[in-house]
Amino acid sequence: MEPAEQPSELVSAEGRNRKAVLCQRCGSRVLQPGTALFSRRQLFLPSMRKKPALSDGSNPDGDLLQEHWLVEDMFIFENVGFTKDVGNIKFLVCADCEIGPIGWHCLDDKNSFYVALERVSHE
C-alpha cells in the first residue's frame, strides 16, 4: 500500500478534495474532485474485508480514524455501496469490488457520509 498523502496535498483552500477519491483495491472512482469536505472526526471502522462479512457486526477488530471526506448527499458518490444496518450505522463499501468499510454513515443523521482518507487512494 502506498503511503498516505498529507491532507494539505489533498485539500483545497475551500476545504474540498483536490483529487478524485478511488478504491484502494480496484481503482474504482468513489468521488469526483471537489465534491467532499475535509473533516476531522474520530470514528471507528472495522478492518477491511468483503461486504458479507461486514454486515454481521460480530468482529470488533478495526481502526480509530480521524481524517475523512464528508459527503452531505448520498447521490454525490460515483460508486459506493452500503452494508445492512449494524445498529444505527451503515458502512460504506466499494460498489465494484465490495471491499470495505471505506466509510461510515449514521442513520440518525441523514446528511453525513464519511469516507476515511486512510481507506481510499487519490488521483
From Swiss-Prot:
Pfam families: Mss4 (PF04421). One of its GO terms (cellular component) is membrane. Keywords: Acetylation, Guanine-nucleotide releasing factor, Metal-binding, Protein transport, Transport, Zinc. Belongs to the DSS4/MSS4 family. Ubiquitous. Zn(2+) binds at residues 23, 26, 94, 97. The modification N-acetylmethionine is found at residue 1. PROSITE patterns: MSS4 (PS51796). This is Guanine nucleotide exchange factor MSS4.
